[in-house]
Amino acid sequence: MADTSFHLKVVSAEKHLYDGEVKHIQVTGSEGELGIYPQHTPLLTAIKPGMVRVVKTSGEEEFIYLSGGILEVQPTGVIVLADTAIRGRDLDEAKALESKRKAEEHIQSSHGDVDYAQASAELAKAIAKLRVIELTRR
């Protein structure tokens, strides 16, 4: 089974969200989308706001929202250390839509680089949450 799966842990400051065997995962790294499969080369990279798509050994998919963090791939398994991590089914669509609206308003009214950068980061997080909600409903 070691050739067809690997151990994944997804943890945030608040809690452990996932701890088990998976076929593969997909996550948004600092340089783009990453697909991690069994026997992947060791890697340490930053994670952008987005999601981790977990494909369990049963073939079932689970989507987890990540606000950012670190991905560590080792021969013994993979660890996602997230700033914030929320299961797709636990996300609140109304709150995500409101966050998106507020961030868009902030971008329109921003007067400096710092305001714009912060609003852009908040917009990216809101869009990522909405994407996870959409994928979870499939």
Curated annotation (Swiss-Prot):
InterPro entries: ATP_F1_dsu/esu_C_sf, ATP_synth_F1_dsu/esu, ATP_synth_F1_dsu/esu_N, ATP_synth_F1_esu_C, ATPsynth_dsu/esu_N. Its main location: membrane. Pfam families: ATP-synt_DE, ATP-synt_DE_N. It is a peripheral membrane protein. Produces ATP from ADP in the presence of a proton gradient across the membrane. Belongs to the ATPase epsilon chain family. This is ATP synthase epsilon chain. The gene is atpC.
